Amino acid sequence: MRIALYSNSPLPVHGYGGTQRVVVWLARGLVELGHQVTVLAPAGSRLREAHVIGLDLEAIRRPDFNVSRYLPEGIDILHAHARLPSPPAHPFVFTLHGNRQDGTAASNTIFLSADHARRHGSTTFVYNGVDPSEYIFRSPKDGYDLFLGRLHSVKGYRWAIHGARRSGKTLVVAGGWRPSWRRSLRYEGSVDGTRKAELLAGADCLWMPALWEEPFGLTLVEAMMSGTPVLGTRRGALPEVVSPDGGLL
């Protein structure tokens, strides 16, 4: 098939950016299966795996943006990973990577988990996947707990700080900004690539005390790929993604 993928963020991502990584991995996997893949993303995006059509960022943000103008001839289907102001003239599906406030979505929307789909009145979902080659599975650990992701209140990072302190562990925080610190915390900032894989492989556990309905939680899979158990809450997709032998909710 001739498949087009659409992202409204530059590719590849540097630092935090789960959705962008999923798009790159999906392009890579589809090419390996023998499909012809074209990626539409902001100008400056580069992918070894697929042909990239660079889009003007200002054009993407306009309410009259029409992605059909940029699609090459012969495309069989468009898979959008960001909302489009108007439906394209080609067959397309849309993966919702967040939550809609009204809890509804179009019939051709793909959700990230059964819980995510149910909360939007659907039963159609596909779990996110990861590229195993980007992770390090390691059994001997380095004696610290890890919090990885956006330092936002809905991510529950304060509970991770409290839990690690109660257990006498050092908590490594890898996120986008630095809150007030205590001596039991170590701040890594935003990480990706090899450093992220090393932190995941070396952690005794990954904290994910989500206080919102996580659509999926890519970090959960990344931790389990690294042999690192998860400590989290029973919110959103966490009970689906974290197996009984993969962590504790």
What do these predicted regions represent?
Residues S9-V13, G29-R62:
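N-terminal strand-loop element at the rim of the active site
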